[in-house]
Regions:
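Beta-rich, blade/repeat-based domains predominating
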Residues: 12-25, 53-73, 90-112, 118-123, ...
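A short helix->beta-strand "capping" segment at the edge of beta-propeller domains
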Residues: 1-14, 43-45, 279-282
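A short loop-to-beta-strand structural motif that recurs across blades of beta-propeller domains
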Residues: 37-39, 75-77, 122-125, 164-166, ...
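Short, solvent-exposed loop/turn segments at conserved positions within beta-propeller repeat blades
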Residues: 33-34, 111-121, 160-163, 208-217, ...
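Short loop/turn segments immediately following beta-strands, especially the blade-tip
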Residues: 168-174, 280-283
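Blade-level signature of beta-propeller repeat domains, shared across WD40, Kelch, NHL, RCC1
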Residues: 241-283
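Beta-strand initiation motifs
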Residues: 1-7, 45-49, 82-86, 127-134, ...
Length: 283
């Protein structure tokens, strides 16, 4: 039996679509889809545009160890210390992850999801220091959020269409091997990992997945390697991304959006109905 977390409280609203939440430098940073902005939100709910993003859907954030911000999308860009934006790699993609050795991983799939294209298997690519990209994993069933375990040894990716978290060993050169299932039967999107190695991910027992109007609109659980679920929290909108942060790292931020299908994205964006919630966790 999992433990239910405290009811989440509203941190910020009035946003278009919120994704790729990351705690950085004392604030929650996120990709503000539909606005082309990277936004930072403090614990009082104050919002600030801190960097340029993308005018498209499907992009995210990560940082190199020296503090420079990476932004994915049609290409991978880097924000320099004095605010200028430069190309880091011509390789575009969706989600990003950077390990302690500064291996930069980007994922994506070669079909037009927003345009209703037929699904194709996705990939993970490693971006070398000179910006070149090489495949390190394939046959990913709609790649989404990625995290690196606290010891830097393992990359875990959300395969959204499969309802699965898959794990890979990270080699000294950034190569991935030893693919295995971390947990399945889920509804993963943007995920995060705590210092004890528990991954916080979306579930598949929500209204959108089940068609049950009595099911919660959104739910996030903490799942251990092997599939054991230890904690749960529910939201009144679908949760697209979650992030751990706060002064002691024990705030769980829940980035929630309306979703009525890709053909209704513009209508959803125009309503500015996205919300960010926060609750407390024991880790």
């Amino acid at each position: 039996m999992s433990t239910m977390l405290p009811t989440p409280r509203l941190l910020a609203d009035g946003l278009k679509m919120v994704e790729s939440g990351r705690w950085h430098d004392g604030r929650l940073w996120l990709a503000h889809w539909g606005s082309g902005e990277v936004i930072a939100v403090d614990l009082a709910g104050n919002k600030e545009v801190v960097a340029p993003g993308r005018n498209t859907m499907g992009w995210s954030l990560a940082w190199l160890s020296d503090g420079r911000l990476l932004v994915s999308g049609e290409e991978l860009t880097r924000v320099e210390p004095y605010g200028s934006t430069v190309r880091h790699s011509a390789q575009g993609g969706n989600e990003l992850a950077v390990d302690p050795a500064d291996h930069v991983f980007v994922n994506g799939a070669d079909f037009d999801f927003v345009g209703g294209g037929a699904p194709e298997p996705g990939w993970i690519r490693l971006i070398d220091e000179d910006g070149t990209a090489r495949d390190v994993a394939g046959d990913i069933d709609f790649p989404n959020g990625m995290v690196v375990t606290p010891d830097g040894s393992t990359l875990v990716i959300a395969e959204s269409f499969a309802g699965r978290l898959s794990a890979f060993d990270i080699g000294p050169d950034g190569a991935l091997s030893g693919r295995r299932t971390w947990a399945d039967g889920l509804g993963p999107d943007g995920i995060c990992i705590d210092p004890e190695g528990g991954i916080w991910t979306q579930t598949a027992d929500t209204a959108a997945h089940t068609g049950d109007d009595n099911a919660p609109a959104g739910a996030v659980v903490r799942v251990l390697d092997g599939g054991e679920i230890t904690h749960r929290v529910e939201t009144d909108l679908p949760c697209f991304s979650c992030a751990l942060g706060g002064p002691d790292g024990r705030h769980l931020f829940l980035l929630c959006n309306e979703f009525e299908g890709v053909d209704q994205l513009e209508a959803v964006l125009s309503r500015r109905s996205a919300r960010i919630y926060v609750t407390d966790v024991p880790f």
